[in-house]
Amino acid sequence: MLLEKSLEEAPVVNRNGYWYFIHPITDGVPELPPELLREVAYRIVRALDSTDFDKIVCVEAMGIHLGALLSDMLDRPLVIVRKREYGLDGEVEITQEKGYGVEKLYLNGVSEGDRVVVVDDVISTGGTLVGLINALDDVGAEIEDVVVVVARGGLDRVREETGVDVKYLVRVEVSEDGVSVVESRYR
């Protein structure tokens, strides 16, 4: 599959002792081939328990291309969790704990009773998803599924802190030697 091959060929860089992989799906660099984006979108759809939900929720920035394509494919509205505050009624501030620090995100456009699917590019520590899932719970949304493309870590944390099992297309390990795909799903 293209996703696995492209991950195994992805360059890695060291930032303060942490090995990051650079990939079109997770970084937008280098260019994102349409056939890779299509493959990922179809695999995400296969991962869903049902397509009977109200909205797709994704996180700025690297969840947007995934969410937009899925929104078009499944004819569902797209909600983008943003990194900037708009001050709209009902806006929810989310604390996003990442491997390299803490940031704020802002959720708009989700109401009590909305059935949502959360889509993101990668999970490393689980901090972003824990914050987002808690915010969705706070507004009374029903989380139908949470799917990420690449799982690097954080799956147990999300399950323990929210009770939600995150689905993923591939699980990877990253070191100075590169990216190793250790599990592949929804092919």
From Swiss-Prot:
Protein name in UniProt: Hypoxanthine/guanine phosphoribosyltransferase
Q: Reaction(s) catalyzed by this protein?
A: IMP + diphosphate = hypoxanthine + 5-phospho-alpha-D-ribose 1-diphosphate; GMP + diphosphate = guanine + 5-phospho-alpha-D-ribose 1-diphosphate
- EC class of this enzyme? transferase
Summarize subunit and interaction data from the UniProt record for this chain: Homodimer.
This protein's pathway:
Purine metabolism; IMP biosynthesis via salvage pathway; IMP from hypoxanthine: step 1/1
- Name the Pfam families for this protein: Pribosyltran
Recorded superkingdom: Archaea
EC number(s) on file: 2.4.2.8
GO terms classed as biological process: IMP salvage; purine ribonucleoside salvage
Q: Where in the cell is it found?
A: Cytoplasm
